[in-house]
From Swiss-Prot:
UniProt-listed Pfam families: ThiC-associated (PF13667), ThiC_Rad_SAM (PF01964)
Details of cofactor binding: Binds 1 [4Fe-4S] cluster per subunit. The cluster is coordinated with 3 cysteines and an exchangeable S-adenosyl-L-methionine.
Similarity comment text for this entry: Belongs to the ThiC family.
Protein name: Phosphomethylpyrimidine synthase
Residues binding [4Fe-4S] cluster, per UniProt: C577, C580, C585
Catalysed reaction equations from the record: 5-amino-1-(5-phospho-beta-D-ribosyl)imidazole + S-adenosyl-L-methionine = 4-amino-2-methyl-5-(phosphooxymethyl)pyrimidine + CO + 5'-deoxyadenosine + formate + L-methionine + 3 H(+)
Biological or metabolic pathway of the protein: Cofactor biosynthesis; thiamine diphosphate biosynthesis
Gene coding for it: thiC
Function text: Catalyzes the synthesis of the hydroxymethylpyrimidine phosphate (HMP-P) moiety of thiamine from aminoimidazole ribotide (AIR) in a radical S-adenosyl-L-methionine (SAM)-dependent reaction.
NCBIfam families cross-referenced by the UniProt entry: PRK09284.1, PRK13352.1, thiC
Keywords: 4Fe-4S, Iron, Iron-sulfur, Lyase, Metal-binding, S-adenosyl-L-methionine, Thiamine biosynthesis, Zinc
Amino acid sequence: MSSRKQARLEAKQFIDTLSVQPYPNSTKVYIEGSRPDIRVPMREISLADSLIGGTKEAPIFEPNEPVRVYDTSGVYTDPDYAIDLYSGLPKLREGWIEERNDTEILEDVSSVYAKERLDDETLDDLRYGNLPRIRRAKAGKCVTQLHYARKGIVTPEMEYIALRENMGRAQYRDDVLTQQHPGQSFGANLPKDITAEFVRKEVAEGRAIIPSNINHPESEPMIIGRNFLVKVNANIGNSSVTSSIEEEVEKLVWATRWGGDTVMDLSTGRNIHETREWILRNSPVPIGTVPMYQALEKVNGIAENLNWEVMRDTLIEQAEQGVDYFTIHAGLLLRYVPMTAKRVTGIVSRGGSIIAKWCLAHHQESFLYTHFREICEICAKYDVALSLGDGLRPGSVADANDEAQFAELRTLGELTKIAWEYDVQVIIEGPGHIPMHMIKENMDQQLEHCHEAPFYTLGPLTTDIAPGYDHITSGIGAAMIGWYGCAMLCYVTPKEHLGLPNKEDVKTGMITYKLAAHAADLAKGHPGAQVRDNALSKARFEFRWEDQFNLALDPDTARAFHDETLPQESGKVAHFCSMCGPKFCSMKISQEVREYAKDTEQVAADQAISIKMLDDPLEGMRKKSEEFRATGSELYHPAVHAEADE
């Protein structure tokens, strides 16, 4: 059997047999809001008690508070839910959408292409079987979260997000957990407690977005903005040479398990429409796409044959399926294309290269630019956010921060203002390949020219010499730009520049980028960001190995690495690991120092350790050496009361 067929069979088995898979020693908890249908999921990690004294026969323990962490995994980790990927997820937001009374149910799909797919009986075996009713804004109505926010309306989505962003940190009473270094926020506004009103205000002013298509009620509300937790996007999608619907659904579930805040379906192969339907109906997180990819497939891959009619039909098709945000490369203008001529790597954006080719072939501005207002009108009817694409992002560090890149960025700022006229939510996409010392300029330029709309970057990669390790080269840049104010990071997997990522590549990319995002939250001083670090550090010092594993971003790998060298159960309680062994563990020695100091705390400091200063330093050293050997060459021993100085 070929490896491709084997991968597809394994993915289908995954879909058919998927069951709830909770995290180790974790419980799915729900925080209730002001109404019973606002239930915000979090993962609560239970911790072992700390040994604080007593004897071997009668030890004294102190309980450790459980730690709550942000949870993107949806019902896939809820033991009370019976998973059925063929039926889809619960429609969490459907009631909220209905009670606003500004949408209508359509009798049929509006897209010509979608109708053709539905009428094609040969697709019956591929098609998702439980298609939902399609909604659209009523005539004269706008249904975006930005519209509601500007009207002063605090939606259930906004209250949900406020509870989610606070991560239940008000429950903590242990000062060890709540201590935190002040951060450097570079002008970000990070309130101690996030309220629903704060969420509304940030959305109203364009500094944050809530991706929430009315046709994707399964998604759990989340926010992307500089003044909130840094988010991470995972890319999935088939290509013309590899992957299947089953594999992409498997990647979706896998990506959200490991922390994907949003997922982009970048499929360019067969059955894009059907693949996307399966993904949307089973996604607890917002889904983004690049509609241009599917539009290109509709004209047989010939960029010059693209036109507004094909693109418009594609936008409506995807909006009615439930896509939460579109990447639109509308800022790439004809006059910017010659600016890339002297680049080392030219135009590396897939969407950017398509638009550039179209502009040159027709020698006019792209239909995305000339029809941008119509794009906004479509988005406003379904609450699809716009992710304004950086088609001229640098593809090598040699091309970083050049004229073409920043010219397009300024145009994206102009388009942002147009989108806001229609109450359409906007984020701005960024690079790319940028060396470390040039990263901050990207954030500064974006804030200046794009009116503080959220920034969303691919990395950036800080060097070009590490194919196979670009999750690391980009993770460095991602942590930095997240610290400077970037709102969402698009993950990079080890397969970047090499091939389509598989399931394990998705996990590696996600863990790397959750690490980068968390490091940025710590550096910004996001309230409560340090709680998990503090809990893990305390567990590490107390040799609570299971707690260390369970608090880790990747408990499975942490446990596996430990067990490679200390597989016995006794290794889970040992006061050392295989790195240093029992005699050289700094934390074990440090604990002994702490116990020694505790035992002698009633003795004056100048008596606790007898170090007598002598007139002859060398003689003093010799005597202390003899004294050390005479007492058994032990690093620590009971204090000896020193004689009074003569």
